[in-house]
């Protein structure tokens, strides 16, 4: 039997694109221990309010909640522990340069499986102000109205 090579999304940070301007995205591996992989495969991970930080030349993902695996008993770890992200040295240096600039942060966009391994889509992002969010909502509404008009026009 041939293994599927598709990327299966396990968790997504839906508010990320609403709250941030995404500048650049990177694929990173994640260091997991114990039964965390089984729990993540069941879809019991939450990326809401999580972010990455660089400490001593290493990137760590903070506040990612992974629910304890039900059959894991003593092997379960702390659900909110810091998890190390696996990146190349040049990527870490580039991310360090970005995050030293005012207003930039590292946020996870999604968690997915690639060839049986859990990967994180990590983005360099800048926070949106409230008026930016309102402007985005206005643009979405206008685009929706245009699409509706075009659809109605094509009916007749």
Swiss-Prot record:
InterPro entries to which the protein is assigned, alphabetical: SmpB, SsrA-bd_prot, SsrA-bd_prot_CS
Example GO BP: trans-translation
Compartment annotation: Cytoplasm
The entry's keywords: Cytoplasm, RNA-binding
A Pfam match: SmpB
GO terms assigned for molecular function: RNA binding
Superkingdom: Bacteria
Keyword Transit peptide found: no
CDD domains: SmpB
GO CC annotations, alphabetized: cytosol
Annotated family: Belongs to the SmpB family.
Function statement: Required for rescue of stalled ribosomes mediated by trans-translation. Binds to transfer-messenger RNA (tmRNA), required for stable association of tmRNA with ribosomes. tmRNA and SmpB together mimic tRNA shape, replacing the anticodon stem-loop with SmpB. tmRNA is encoded by the ssrA gene; the 2 termini fold to resemble tRNA(Ala) and it encodes a 'tag peptide', a short internal open reading frame. During trans-translation Ala-aminoacylated tmRNA acts like a tRNA, entering the A-site of stalled ribosomes, displacing the stalled mRNA.
Protein name: SsrA-binding protein
Organism: Clostridium tetani (strain Massachusetts / E88)
């Amino acid at each position: 039997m041939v293994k599927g090579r598709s990327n299966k999304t396990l968790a997504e940070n839906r508010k990320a694109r609403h709250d941030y301007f995404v500048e650049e995205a990177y694929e990173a591996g994640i260091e997991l221990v114990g039964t965390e992989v089984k729990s993540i495969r069941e879809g019991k991970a939450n990326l809401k309010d999580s972010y990455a930080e660089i400490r001593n030349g290493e990137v760590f993902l903070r506040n990612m909640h992974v629910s304890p695996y039900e059959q894991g008993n003593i092997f379960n770890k702390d659900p909110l522990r810091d998890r190390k992200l696996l990146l190349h040295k040049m990527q870490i240096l580039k991310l360090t340069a970005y995050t030293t600039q005012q207003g930039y942060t590292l946020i996870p966009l999604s968690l997915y499986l690639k060839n049986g391994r859990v990967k994180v889509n990590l983005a360099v992002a800048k926070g949106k102000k409230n008026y930016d969010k309102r402007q985005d909502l206005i643009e979405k509404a206008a685009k929706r109205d245009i699409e509706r008009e075009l659809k109605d026009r094509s009916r007749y």
